[in-house]
């Protein structure tokens, strides 16, 4: 019986951790989208295409870095 309790607590704990991580990733994605929207608005005002390209490359490198580091 004690083994079942420990297993249940472990499963619940891991589930809470994964939910917490998912919420954090969701917030980060929303923040990135807001930043991208601000950059797009700034680009529409005439800042040029070079900043848009740099922003795209930076975003891609950020996602690749997160995937490699697992963060």
UniProtKB/Swiss-Prot annotation:
Compositional bias ranges of the Basic and acidic residues kind: 44-55
Superkingdom of origin: Eukaryota
GO CC list: extracellular region
Major localization class: secreted
Compartments, as annotated in UniProt: Secreted
Tissues expressing this chain: Expressed by the skin glands.
Modification after translation (UniProt): Frenatin 2.3S is not amidated.
Tagged with keyword DNA-binding: yes
Record-linked InterPro entries: Frog_antimicrobial_propeptide (IPR004275)
Modified positions (Glycine amide) in chain numbering: 70
Region (Disordered): 21-56
GO molecular function: DNA binding
The entry's keywords: Amidation, Amphibian defense peptide, Antibiotic, Antimicrobial, Antiviral protein, Cleavage on pair of basic residues, DNA-binding, Immunity, Innate immunity, Pharmaceutical, Secreted, Signal
Maturation-removed propeptide residues: 23-54
Signal peptide: 1-22
GO biological process, one term: regulation of defense response to virus
Compositionally biased intervals (Acidic residues): 28-43
Keyword DNA-binding annotated: yes
Family: Belongs to the frog skin active peptide (FSAP) family. Frenatin subfamily.
Protein name: Frenatin 2.3S
Organism of origin: Sphaenorhynchus lacteus (Orinoco lime treefrog)
